[in-house]
From Swiss-Prot:
Lineage: Bacteria, Bacillati, Cyanobacteriota, Cyanophyceae, Synechococcales
Record-stated family: Belongs to the ATPase delta chain family.
Molecular function, one GO term: proton-transporting ATP synthase activity, rotational mechanism
Keyword line: ATP synthesis, CF(1), Hydrogen ion transport, Ion transport, Membrane, Thylakoid, Transport
The organism of origin for this protein: Prochlorococcus marinus (strain MIT 9312)
A GO term from the CC aspect: proton-transporting ATP synthase complex
Localization per Swiss-Prot or TrEMBL: Cellular thylakoid membrane
InterPro entries in the cross-refs: ATP_synth_OSCP/delta_N_sf (IPR026015), ATPase_OSCP/dsu (IPR000711)
Record-given protein name: ATP synthase subunit delta
């Protein structure tokens, strides 16, 4: 998505610059993650904000109504700016790009761990230690997902690196070796 990045990056960098100046970076990162979760959980809201039928003022009214008590003033003003500039339709992409740039600047690796069952805190800690060694970074943001089809074990991915320690993968490999 290089073309989309060329549109989202300036907005994401501008938001990061504002929060860095106001020393609100950690707070903003938390709010952006919550906002992304909200948008993910309510596709109707995202469709309404993306709709070309709704006027800019109507979109701003929706933004104020829904977010004025949930986000800080910097983020609220940013959302209204995106509505004014007809960019609110790519809000999710802009917020994801903001988080990417934040992680790059803070040297934080993003790891996704998919397991067959919910991981305990101890398991998350052990996996985090292993991934930190592989990724070569001191900080790691861990996103966990559940996929019962793995049967057991986990699959971890950091950037282009994938560690497949799932039982399903081992069974598949065993089946391939037996079929030869």
């Amino acid at each position: 998505m290089p073309l989309l990045n060329s549109v989202t990056t300036p907005y994401a960098e501008a938001l990061l610059q504002v929060v860095n100046e106001n020393l609100q970076t950690e707070e903003m990162v938390s709010e952006v993650k919550q906002l992304l979760e909200l948008l993910n959980d309510s596709p109707e809201l995202e469709k309404a904000l993306s709709s070309p039928i709704l006027e800019t003022e109507a979109k701003k009214k929706i933004i104020i109504e829904i977010f004025s008590n949930k986000v800080n003033s910097s983020l609220l003003n940013f959302l209204k700016l995106l509505a004014d500039r007809q960019r609110i339709g790519i809000l999710t992409s802009i917020l994801n790009r903001f988080l990417e740039i934040y992680r790059e600047n803070s040297n934080i690796a993003l790891a996704t761990v998919t397991s067959a069952v919910e991981l305990t805190d101890e398991q998350k800690g052990l996996i985090t230690q292993k991934i930190v060694n592989i990724a070569g970074t001191q900080k790691l943001e861990l996103v966990t997902k559940i996929d019962p089809s793995l049967i057991g074990g986990f699959v971890a991915s950091v950037g282009s690196k994938v560690i497949d320690a799932s039982l399903a993968s081992q069974i598949r490999k065993l089946g391939l070796s037996l079929s030869k």
